[in-house]
């Protein structure tokens, strides 16, 4: 059974994962949500202006009223007010005790282990909350995301053909990974 705790601050040696706040809008827009390269393999289009980002943030912040919301801002410890990415449970199935994880990071910070470090912490936290299975997917043309999942111990489960649409409305194949709580025992 899941004991929902919501989005709590989590820190490692290099990063802080924390709830988003309204002051994050400009850094979000500047660092990743308006970047076509960052959003290339995602289902949502780059934000066209700061107002789109503010509307997105408003929705996310209101969702924190529920303990069933898990959505973190990724920041470096040395600059906790500059949000460089996001990670969270984009879908939760309480009956099956499962969560689906999504993440996004400013390209300036790619290949530095930041998402892997963040994902490891989120996996641990969600299993502590009582989740049994945590899964993640990536566009097959984005193998770097799959490397993050593997690095965090997630197991490759297969390719789902034409299972999602990208931000241009085109169907694409996804690679699916998952980690079970029992995998850690």
Labelled PLM ranges:
Residues 39-59:
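Conserved GNAT-fold acetyl-CoA-binding loop/helix
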